[in-house]
Amino acid sequence: MRRLGPWVVSVVVGLSCSTVFAETGKAVIQGTSAGSKVSGTAKLTDTRQGLKVVVNVAGVPPGKHGLHIHEKGACGDQGKAAGGHFNPAKVPHGFLPKDGPTKAHAGDMGNIDVGPNGSGKLAVVLPGVSLKGTGGTPSVDGRAIILHEKVDDFGQPTGNAGGRIGCGVIETTKE
């Protein structure tokens, strides 16, 4: 028993000195057209319930705007380079947090409400999705977040949210 003491102390000291980094994702959102004042950030964190996404935007026209993860990690051509909604299960459009992964695209985040000052925040958990494809779930790493010009009415096939006014590519970071 006496010999175990120094070993336990060395393990505890070693663990307390090590740094553990959690992988998170981030996207820097910028306007998709010349002269646009749209800007923002998205932070993505895996949780037991799914992928937590927190988006903050500024310089956006007031009102509700559709917010989706798109299939490609590119923002060129006024956001069109991002392709369509991220939909690996080939299911109808919907609101993922409410409808679940069998009745909504993997990237359907709903709407962000932007106030009169042009800023807005959305915090949502996307079930059945992860940053890096953990546990066989679809991965969003390297894909784009698109801010649309209009409200997502959850209609088919893509919610009628109009053009793409903001875009940011999701990248993995260490925290």
Show where each model-derived region lies:
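N-terminal secretory signal peptides that target proteins for export/translocation
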Residues: 1-2
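N-terminal leader/targeting pre-sequences
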Residues: 5, 12-14, 18-175
